[in-house]
């Protein structure tokens, strides 16, 4: 049985491809998700995707993943800098996760430099554009342990 990966995108990432393309590029979220699903399958893994602009919905999806996925790739968007609640949900389910950002948040406004997730993430991918999603999915598929099937 291959690994099961959950890809979560936070607020405004539904606007990928149209929102500030000079920062985020012109690839849409639908294109990113399709590419990541195909890449996961080529590695023998499965990928589920989820996007929400609402903190509570993201928390609910993380909690629903408990016992069902081997790893999470999360681009928390602006919640990176504000959400202790999403951090607590990730820690509460005990699923290893990769934190991902399309842009180099450390080269942007100073308030974007702090993350509530980085110190607990298994890895952080920053500034590689949408290619970072493929890197994250590949890392989870090849390096994370499969959950125990009881």
Swiss-Prot record:
Its EC number is 4.2.1.10. It holds the Pfam family DHquinase_II. Pathway: Aromatic compound metabolism; 3,4-dihydroxybenzoate biosynthesis; 3,4-dihydroxybenzoate from 3-dehydroquinate: step 1/2. InterPro entries: DHquinase_II, DHquinase_II_CS, DHquinase_II_sf. GO terms for biological process: 3,4-dihydroxybenzoate biosynthetic process; quinate catabolic process. The record marks 19 as: Transition state stabilizer. Keywords: Lyase, Quinate metabolism. Gene3D superfamilies: Dehydroquinase, class II. The keyword Lyase applies. Substrate binds at residues 75, 81, 88, 102-103, 112. Signal peptide: none annotated. One of its GO terms (molecular function) is 3-dehydroquinate dehydratase activity. The active site is at 24 (proton acceptor), 101 (proton donor). Is involved in the catabolism of quinate. Allows the utilization of quinate as carbon source via the beta-ketoadipate pathway. Belongs to the type-II 3-dehydroquinase family. This is Catabolic 3-dehydroquinase 1. It comes from Neosartorya fischeri (strain ATCC 1020 / DSM 3700 / CBS 544.65 / FGSC A1164 / JCM 1740 / NRRL 181 / WB 181) (Aspergillus fischerianus). The gene is qutE1.
